[in-house]
């Protein structure tokens, strides 16, 4: 269920803006999206796991805030990120 360190490093390498980047909004949003997707799969099989559901809602809210920040600060980076992640339809 949890995101492994290897998978997290792959995501960071894919979305980073420079060599030592681990905290840019793009990286944070990509890692949160991966965590949200894995937790979503978990909740499909364990429908009554309300503690995990609350964690999922907190992650979705944090990702929404980061996306709003990125949209307000740099719209081109925001558009590139949502197309890469496939967030908006």
Curated annotation (Swiss-Prot):
It comes from the Bacteria. One of its GO terms (molecular function) is rRNA binding. GO terms for biological process: translation. This is Small ribosomal subunit protein uS15. Keywords: Ribonucleoprotein, Ribosomal protein, RNA-binding, rRNA-binding. SMART domains: Ribosomal_S15. Part of the 30S ribosomal subunit. Forms a bridge to the 50S subunit in the 70S ribosome, contacting the 23S rRNA. One of its GO terms (cellular component) is cytosolic small ribosomal subunit. Pfam families: Ribosomal_S15 (PF00312). Belongs to the universal ribosomal protein uS15 family. One of the primary rRNA binding proteins, it binds directly to 16S rRNA where it helps nucleate assembly of the platform of the 30S subunit by binding and bridging several RNA helices of the 16S rRNA. Forms an intersubunit bridge (bridge B4) with the 23S rRNA of the 50S subunit in the ribosome. It comes from Bacillus cereus (strain ATCC 14579 / DSM 31 / CCUG 7414 / JCM 2152 / NBRC 15305 / NCIMB 9373 / NCTC 2599 / NRRL B-3711). NCBIfam families: S15_bact.
